């Protein structure tokens, strides 16, 4: 090959490289970190689709800062260490500007050190146990004071529940939430003998003995309820076994924190009518914004039978907040976006306007829904206004004096109001 031809070839290759770099730079990359396989796929696949819809819709509006948005989708496969590996790849290899993802707290805890080390921006869309506030994470799901505590109050005040079964999957979210609930119930005068706690592994399928134990526990003459933090596809055999053993909502009502419209779509809901769920959004919410969202979702997914649920709304809120913050900051640079997000407001899907608080949690209504035969929820209770999420529980001794405030000059995730000190680690 002649020197001239080599020069032409090298020049062409260089120009192709520059062109590819420019194309890449002309998009803003969004990481989508949700399980598309494994035990959590039943819940998380829909959240991946939600993000693709939101990104497509924003691109139709012109994108952000004059650039199109590009989704980078990965599958951590319900494998908790793999979440961290995939998150690192999204930031270091794919150069994403923000990540939306996770469902379980164990996956979030796996991702968190990576997000902080590489100083990225992460939106977490699912209810969780609290006891955490990171500068890099924005929690658009419910904290315990926005779901678990109000659900217990409803069961206690409206149904007269006196005995409590705290049933959960064996990982950090159910264990910490139940620790908070046990402390709360004890403070309300409930005896320890009236509290039953049970944990099962992810994907648990044999519920016969456990449901039988619940039935026996509820036969002591006091109104009994199950507070469920069971996650993933284990919910399907759990509810089936309730039906098999004839446990109806009038006998022992179940209030679930991780069962919504998507999970019910795979069940025979007949035996489940009357059981409850506590969320901040239901598909049945009567609001114009919700009608528009549902119509857009069904058109995007090309299936009129597909439902919407609470974590989808959380992604809707979080994504719109991120767009506003980036436009406000004029950049996708992480620290500028983190600062710009505080105070950002956006309409939610229940008719209100949610705000991002200094502790990186948002304001949300609290709703209790009753399962109907068609797999939808009848909203039987709702707060008068929006409730701000607490990062730290008022009912745990080590947390009740802590607050999170990421505004300068405090800029702390666990500031002790009694000692006036920031403890450093935020989780």
Regions found by a protein language model. Give the residues of each.
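Sec/Tat signal peptide C-region and signal peptidase I cleavage site
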Residues: 19-25
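Periplasmic-binding protein-like
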Residues: 90-102, 123-125, 163-168, 220-232, ...
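Bacterial N-terminal signal peptides that target proteins for export
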Residues: 1-11
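Beta-alpha junction/loop-to-helix N-cap segments that form part of ligand/metal-binding clefts
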Residues: 42-49, 61-131, 140, 199-208
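Extracytoplasmic "Venus flytrap"
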Residues: 31-50, 74-81, 103-106, 170-175, ...
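Solvent-exposed, acidic/polar segments of extracytosolic/periplasmic ligand-binding ectodomains
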Residues: 28, 345-427
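Extracellular/periplasmic periplasmic-binding protein-like sensory domains
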Residues: 241-316, 326-332, 383-414, 423
């Amino acid at each position: 090959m002649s020197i001239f031809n080599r020069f032409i070839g090298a020049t062409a290759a260089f120009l192709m490289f520059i062109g590819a770099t420019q194309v890449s730079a002309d998009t803003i990359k969004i990481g989508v970190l949700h399980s598309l396989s494994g035990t959590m796929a039943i819940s998380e696949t829909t959240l991946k689709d939600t993000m693709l819809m939101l990104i497509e819709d924003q691109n139709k509006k012109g994108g952000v800062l004059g650039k199109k948005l590009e989704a980078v989708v990965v599958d951590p496969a319900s494998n908790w260490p793999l979440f961290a590996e995939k998150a690192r790849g999204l930031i270091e290899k794919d150069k994403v500007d923000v990540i939306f993802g996770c469902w379980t707290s164990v996956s979030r805890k796996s991702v968190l050190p990576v997000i902080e080390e590489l100083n990225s921006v992460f939106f977490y869309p699912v209810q969780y146990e609290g006891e955490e506030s990171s500068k890099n994470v924005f929690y658009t799901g419910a904290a315990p004071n926005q779901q678990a505590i109000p659900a217990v109050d409803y069961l206690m005040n409206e149904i007269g529940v006196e005995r409590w079964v705290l049933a959960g999957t064996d990982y950090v979210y159910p264990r910490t939430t139940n620790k908070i609930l046990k402390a709360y119930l004890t403070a309300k005068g409930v005896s320890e003998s009236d509290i039953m706690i049970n944990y099962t592994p992810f994907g648990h399928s044999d519920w016969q003995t456990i449901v039988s134990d619940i039935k026996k526990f509820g036969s002591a003459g006091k109104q009994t309820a199950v507070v469920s933090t069971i996650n993933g596809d284990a919910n399907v055999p759990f509810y089936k076994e309730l039906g098999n053993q004839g446990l109806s909502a009038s006998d022992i009502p179940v209030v679930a924190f991780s069962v919504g419209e998507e999970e019910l779509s795979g069940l025979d809901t007949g035996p489940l009518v009357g059981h409850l769920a506590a969320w901040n959004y239901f598909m049945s919410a009567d609001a114009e914004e919700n009608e528009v969202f549902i119509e857009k979702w069904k058109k995007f997914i090309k299936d009129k039978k597909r439902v919407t649920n609470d974590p989808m709304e959380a992604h809707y809120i979080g994504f719109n907040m991120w767009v506003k913050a980036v436009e406000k900051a004029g950049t996708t640079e992480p620290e500028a976006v983190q600062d710009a997000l505080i105070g950002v407001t956006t309409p939610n899907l229940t008719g209100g306007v949610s705000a991002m608080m200094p502790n990186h949690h948002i304001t949300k209504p609290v709703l209790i829904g009753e399962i109907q035969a068609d797999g939808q929820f009848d909203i039987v209770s709702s707060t008068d206004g929006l409730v701000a999420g607490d990062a730290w529980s008022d009912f745990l001794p080590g947390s009740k004096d802590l607050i999170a405030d990421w505004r300068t000059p405090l800029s702390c995730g666990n500031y002790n109001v009694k000692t006036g000190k920031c403890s450093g680690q935020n989780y």
